[in-house]
């Protein structure tokens, strides 16, 4: 059965789910929700996602929202299909979960407001919060140093295999790398930059960029 994904393919959270689908070889259909016209806030979409965000999925009678929950669900449902994203043992899965949580609580809390202020607001003709941006860059640098140290002795965040721990970072990283200052911050950290170059060379990422019009 084809999974229906409601969202905008250029948005980071739908991209997280799409990357999972592409890594697992899951058939999907994208139902476009236009974020620029706030379609996600309309009553019909609020029935799918009561907080007015994207993505949401429909898989037959099964419905789910929140990108990380969706990605984990399909990585589990299709554990034996495509890339193993969850880990090969209980201990490995715990490390995958650990670094996926790091993405949520340490990385994304900085990446998301940076993307909003440096990419989305200028596109909408709005002013960014310069003071906030500079503070976020400093904090991001500290986080990237920790990642760089981790990746100096590990090929990927959870060890020697690409997993959900890596995948969940990719949409925001794609946006951050288009920001000159942050691109330079990444390239100044050799192990972190090596990791990004490797994961952004995966077929799933290249296919996603085509879907997103890049």
Curated annotation (Swiss-Prot):
PANTHER family: GLUTATHIONE S-TRANSFERASE F12 (PTHR43900:SF54), GLUTATHIONE S-TRANSFERASE RHO (PTHR43900). It catalyses: RX + glutathione = an S-substituted glutathione + a halide anion + H(+). It comes from Arabidopsis thaliana. Residues 89-214 form the GST C-terminal domain. The lineage of its organism: Eukaryota, Viridiplantae, Streptophyta, Embryophyta, Tracheophyta. Disruption phenotype: Great reduction of anthocyanin pigments in the vegetative parts and brown pigments in the seed coat. Accumulation of unextractable proanthocyanidins. Keywords: Cytoplasm, Detoxification, Stress response, Transferase. It comes from the Eukaryota. Involved in the transport and/or accumulation of both anthocyanins and proanthocyanidins (PA)s in the vacuole. Functions in the cytosol to maintain the regular accumulation in the vacuole of PA precursors, such as epicatechin and glycosylated epicatechin. This is Glutathione S-transferase F12. Pfam families: GST_C, GST_N. Its EC number is 2.5.1.18. Residues 2-82 form the GST N-terminal domain. Belongs to the GST superfamily. Phi family. GO terms for molecular function: cation binding; glutathione transferase activity. Its main location: cytoplasm.
């Amino acid at each position: 059965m084809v999974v229906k994904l409601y969202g905008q393919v250029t948005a980071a959270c739908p991209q997280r789910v799409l990357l999972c689908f592409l890594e697992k070889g899951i058939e999907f259909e994208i139902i476009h929700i236009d974020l620029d016209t706030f379609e996600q806030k309309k009553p019909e979409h609020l029935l799918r996602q009561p907080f007015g965000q994207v993505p949401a999925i429909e898989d037959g009678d099964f419905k789910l929202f929140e990108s990380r929950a969706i990605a984990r669900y399909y990585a589990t449902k299709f554990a034996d299909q495509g890339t193993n994203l969850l880990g090969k043992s209980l201990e490995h899965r715990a490390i995958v979960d650990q670094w996926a949580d790091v993405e949520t609580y340490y990385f994304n809390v900085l990446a998301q407001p940076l993307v909003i202020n440096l990419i989305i607001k200028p596109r909408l003709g709005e002013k960014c919060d310069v003071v906030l941006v500079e503070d976020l860059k400093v904090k991001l640098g500290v986080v990237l140093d920790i990642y760089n140290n981790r990746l100096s002795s590990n090929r990927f965040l959870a060890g020697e295999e690409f997993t959900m721990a890596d995948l969940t970072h990719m949409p925001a990283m794609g946006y951050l790398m288009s920001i000159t200052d942050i691109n330079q911050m990444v390239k100044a950290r050799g192990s972190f930059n090596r990791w990004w170059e490797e994961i952004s060379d995966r077929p799933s990422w290249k296919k996603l960029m085509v879907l997103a019009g890049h």
